[in-house]
């Protein structure tokens, strides 16, 4: 079979026309220095701030410093295998984390990778970890309560959905316990909880996860953990990863609670990164933008307007103080960003008053408008009474002959302190809180010996559950107090059957 010359030429033409050359242009750079979670690379002229970069061994990095001749990269993973002279290439993607309901019940690292040994997570969506906070017109004022189940907080320092309430105190004063109790109390509240552990011991995080699992709270909780053994970039990114996961739910009209435990360690990690990147240090060696580090995170907590779906993110950031010094740099920064603070005092904690809330220094700037009417009515004077008692208590140590009014205030104060004590992991529904505070503020407990107050409380709750369930149901469903006569009659009836220990 002979092939004609014109056939050969047409075949060659066809081949040339159908030939496709896949030329990939990649922007690459060279590592010139590496160490302590930081790499310095030459090249990569067109890189974006915050862009993900890939090293030759597959480890990812994030562009942080953009300079004239080189870029500073924070390494998101083990950096021991990255060498001077290695290639680093652009991905064209901004740092993102996986989001969605598939994450509920799981423990992940700040990159959204599972670390609980329960296999991969099949998410379908992701969100950038840095995103703009909702604007003024997209927000609505805080008006729905977030019940923590902790008497001293729900009565005196109430928190609303969409609020940012700082929890501040020395180490070992019960900050994490407040977080866990608040998560446990959201069981039937249709609230998604995100617990971000920053720089905690792995054993501590495991304990928190186990507590949540045993009490059925892990089903509506995501745990994001950057432990103390992780490199500084992971600790720096963890809070942003947590709030991005929360935003996915918020923009779909759901309510989210995000707990950052704690932001002092994030600030320390950011200081470490900044100093390694040769950024100029400021007060306490923190970089100049450490305020912006926290403000851009906490401004993403909001109560959205109805037009945007009415979802919310409530933020509970933690700050650890040194010897109760709330006037240090990071504490004052975060106090000025948030809508109030709950101050936990170590001497109250050690004297057996737990939760160790200092009512005088704690404040909630917007939570009052979110309280239910019944709670507002019964707890109105509670904070002032407690603050007055603290003053009188110090004063009364010097003199024994006190007038009747002062003695009555001291007696009421002692009973108030006892009522506000609460056991660990024992959150209380709001209707029971209203009932016991009503009994306290209306003077029904003034004749109960101080040592019997807690027994009075538990027996009173049992009595209400069995005999006066309608009163509790009324508070829960309507948010209002029952008729005064009915409530008083119920308390009087219970007191007849209550026997004091002395």
UniProtKB/Swiss-Prot annotation:
Subcellular location(s) per record: Cell membrane
Enzyme Commission (EC) number: 7.1.2.2
Membrane topology, record value: Peripheral membrane protein
Positions of the record's site feature: Required for activity: 362
Annotated region (Disordered), positions in chain: 119-139
GO cellular component: plasma membrane; proton-transporting ATP synthase complex
Major location (coarse): membrane
Residues binding ATP: 169-176
Keywords, comma-separated and alphabetical: ATP synthesis, ATP-binding, Cell membrane, CF(1), Hydrogen ion transport, Ion transport, Membrane, Nucleotide-binding, Translocase, Transport
Catalyzed reactions per annotation: ATP + H2O + 4 H(+)(in) = ADP + phosphate + 5 H(+)(out)
UniProt-listed CDD domains: ATP-synt_F1_alpha_C (cd18113), ATP-synt_F1_alpha_N (cd18116), F1-ATPase_alpha_CD (cd01132)
Pfam families for this protein: ATP-synt_ab, ATP-synt_ab_C, ATP-synt_ab_N
MF term (GO), any: ADP binding
Family: Belongs to the ATPase alpha/beta chains family.
Task of the protein: Produces ATP from ADP in the presence of a proton gradient across the membrane. The alpha chain is a regulatory subunit.
Assembly, per entry: F-type ATPases have 2 components, CF(1) - the catalytic core - and CF(0) - the membrane proton channel. CF(1) has five subunits: alpha(3), beta(3), gamma(1), delta(1), epsilon(1). CF(0) has three main subunits: a(1), b(2) and c(9-12). The alpha and beta chains form an alternating ring which encloses part of the gamma chain. CF(1) is attached to CF(0) by a central stalk formed by the gamma and epsilon chains, while a peripheral stalk is formed by the delta and b chains.
NCBIfam families registered for this protein in UniProt: atpA, PRK13343.1
The protein's name: ATP synthase subunit alpha
Gene (name only): atpA
């Amino acid at each position: 079979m002979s092939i004609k010359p014109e056939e050969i030429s047409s075949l060659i033409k066809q081949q040339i026309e159908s030939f496709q050359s896949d030329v990939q242009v990649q922007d690459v750079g060279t590592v010139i220095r590496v160490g302590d979670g930081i790499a310095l690379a030459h090249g990569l002229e067109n890189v974006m701030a915050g862009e993900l970069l890939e090293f030759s061994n597959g480890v990812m990095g994030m562009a942080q410093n953009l300079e004239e001749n080189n870029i500073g990269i924070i390494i998101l993973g083990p950096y021991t295998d990255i060498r001077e002279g290695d290639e680093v290439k652009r991905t064209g993607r901004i740092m993102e984390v996986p989001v969605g309901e598939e994450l509920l019940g799981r423990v992940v690292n700040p990159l959204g990778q599972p670390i609980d040994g329960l296999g991969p997570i099949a998410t379908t969506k992701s969100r950038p970890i840095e995103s703009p906070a909702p604007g003024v017109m997209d927000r609505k004022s805080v008006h729905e309560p977030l019940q923590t189940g902790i008497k001293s907080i729900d009565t005196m320092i109430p928190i609303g959905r969409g609020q940012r309430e700082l929890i501040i105190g020395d180490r070992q004063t019960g900050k994490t316990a407040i977080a866990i109790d608040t998560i446990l109390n959201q069981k039937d509240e249709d609230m998604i909880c995100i617990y971000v552990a920053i720089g905690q011991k792995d054993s501590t995080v495991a304990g928190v996860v186990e507590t949540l699992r045993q009490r059925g709270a892990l089903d509506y909780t995501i745990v994001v953990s950057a432990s103390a053994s992780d490199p500084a970039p992971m600790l720096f990114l963890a809070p942003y990863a947590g709030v991005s996961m929360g935003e996915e739910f918020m923009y779909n009209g759901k309510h989210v609670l995000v707990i950052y435990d704690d932001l002092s360690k994030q600030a320390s990690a950011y200081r470490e990164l900044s100093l390694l990147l040769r950024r100029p240090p400021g007060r306490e060696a923190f970089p100049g933008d450490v305020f912006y580090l926290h403000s851009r995170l906490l401004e993403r907590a909001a109560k959205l307007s109805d037009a945007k779906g009415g979802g919310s993110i409530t933020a509970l950031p933690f700050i650890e103080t040194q010897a109760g010094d709330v006037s240090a740099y990071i504490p004052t920064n975060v106090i000025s960003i948030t809508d109030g603070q709950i101050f936990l005092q170590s001497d109250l904690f050690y004297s057996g008053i737990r939760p160790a809330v200092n009512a005088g220094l704690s404040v909630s700037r917007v939570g009052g408008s979110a309280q239910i009417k019944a709670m507002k009515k019964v707890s109105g004077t509670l904070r002032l009474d407690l603050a007055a008692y603290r003053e009188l208590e110090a004063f009364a140590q010097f003199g024994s002959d006190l007038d009747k009014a002062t003695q009555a205030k001291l007696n009421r104060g002692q009973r108030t302190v006892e009522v506000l004590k609460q056991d660990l992991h024992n959150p209380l529904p709001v209707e029971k809180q209203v009932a016991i505070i009503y009994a306290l503020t209306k003077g029904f407990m003034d004749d109960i010996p101080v040592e019997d107050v807690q027994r009075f409380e538990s027996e009173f709750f049992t009595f209400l559950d069995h005999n006066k369930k309608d009163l509790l149901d009324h508070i829960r469903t309507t948010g209002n107090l029952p008729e005064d006569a009915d409530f008083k009659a119920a308390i009087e009836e219970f007191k007849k059957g209550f026997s004091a220990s002395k």
